[in-house]
Swiss-Prot record:
Organism: Homo sapiens (Human)
Name of the protein in question: Serum paraoxonase/lactonase 3
Family, similarity comment: Belongs to the paraoxonase family.
PTM annotation: The signal sequence is not cleaved.
GO cellular component: endoplasmic reticulum membrane; extracellular exosome; extracellular region; extracellular space
This enzyme's EC code(s): 3.1.1.2, 3.1.1.81, 3.1.8.1
Free-text remark on how the cofactor is bound: Binds 2 calcium ions per subunit.
Disulfide bonds: 42-352
Length: 354
């Protein structure tokens, strides 16, 4: 009798899991395909073959690119190679990417870079903050950029018990930043069920040497984060919920949600067009192809522009869309003077002149 009860309970449990998985597939638009939107003047960057998960561009046009991310459940074309930070000068007629040398005693063999953020100090010194996943844990690395030598000098590693499963950061002061946590569980299997169950246990935290605190919570999977040009508002992408949260920043660093913009596609990293204040979002139109990678039927790419962010009816338009024949798994798009760099989690990088 006990075995029969156990079998019945197992059957009920498996049935519930199956129903939840089907609901998850529907929730994330698993079978969605995109109509192509491709600017005419585009080409792939030869030097970037192992992803360009995040991109941040200085006002001078120098673009920093994180490459080589190894992330649970995602493809990787160079699993034995450590990650790198690349630099591109978008002022050049035919910009190329070069890997930046890192000095200062940093363990480059364990470098697994994810989200990045630039901070320019009052004396114009440029610092690069990098989310790193050595041994699949989460730290934030601080580097100083040496422009003449085109290199990075390692300064410091930040660790904290709240800095777990960190995805992205945006730096607003010396060692002062917001960071997103994309999964509550760090175990791959548990984090998978976390998404299926739509638990919404992830959050945004604020870090400073004096204070570390959760400032926004209730996200399914808090992902990309950036700040408005005037630094009054913080934008947070909830990738599995397919939306962007518009948050007001207060003097004590707390955040208050003003609105949520639904996009109907899985939103990864966010950047702001410095010329217009528009949000650019790198998106995943068909995530199941990303999780179950098949080179014969690859995941597509999508970049959206969100205009009039604070208005009652923001305008959403497609900047780029491809079925995976050119670019797979778009994670970010960043613009500079009519030029756009489109990065991916594990694939190539596209440069276009708009």
């Amino acid at each position: 009798m006990g075995k029969l009860v156990a079998l019945v309970l197992l059957g009920v449990g498996l049935s519930l899991v199956g129903e939840m998985f089907l609901a998850f597939r529907e929730r994330v638009n698993a079978s969605r395909e995109v109509e192509p939107v491709e600017p005419e003047n585009c080409h792939l960057i030869e030097e970037l073959e192992s992803g360009s998960e995040d991109i941040d561009i200085l006002p001078s046009g120098l673009a920093f690119i994180s490459s080589g991310l190894k992330y649970p459940g995602m493809p990787n074309f160079a699993p034995d190679e450590p990650g790198k930070i690349f630099l591109m000068d978008l002022n050049e007629q035919n910009p190329r990417a070069q890997a930046l040398e890192i000095s200062g005693g940093f363990d480059k063999e364990l470098f697994n870079p994810h989200g990045i953020s630039i901070f320019i100090d009052k004396d114009n010194t440029v610092y690069l903050y990098v989310v790193n996943h050595p041994h699949m844990k989460s730290t934030v690395e601080i580097f100083k950029f040496e422009e003449q030598q085109r290199s990075l000098v390692y300064l410091k590693t930040i660790k904290h018990e709240l800095l777990k499963s960190v995805n992205d950061i945006v730096v607003l002061g010396p060692e002062q930043f917001y960071a997103t946590r994309d999964h509550y569980f760090t175990n791959s299997l548990l984090s998978f069920f976390e998404m299926i169950l739509d638990l919404r246990w992830t959050y945004v935290l604020f870090y400073s040497p004096r204070e570390v605190k959760v400032v926004a919570k209730g996200f399914c999977s808090a992902n990309g984060i950036t700040v408005s040009a005037d630094q009054k508002y913080v934008y947070v992408a909830d990738v599995a919920a397919k939306n962007i949260h518009i948050m007001e920043k207060h003097d004590n660093w707390d955040l208050t949600q003003l609105k949520v913009i639904q996009l109907g596609t899985l939103v990864d990293n966010l950047t702001v067009d410095p010329a217009t204040g528009d949000i650019l979002a790198g998106c995943h139109p068909n995530p199941m192809k990303l999780l179950n990678y098949n080179p014969e039927d690859p995941p597509g790419s999508e970049v959206l522009r969100i205009q009039n962010v604070l208005s009652e009816k923001p305008r959403v338009s497609t900047v780029y869309a491809n079925n995976g024949s050119v670019l797979q798994g778009t994670s970010v798009a960043s613009v500079y003077h009519g030029k756009i760099l489109i990065g991916t989690v594990f694939h190539k990088t596209l440069y276009c002149e708009l």
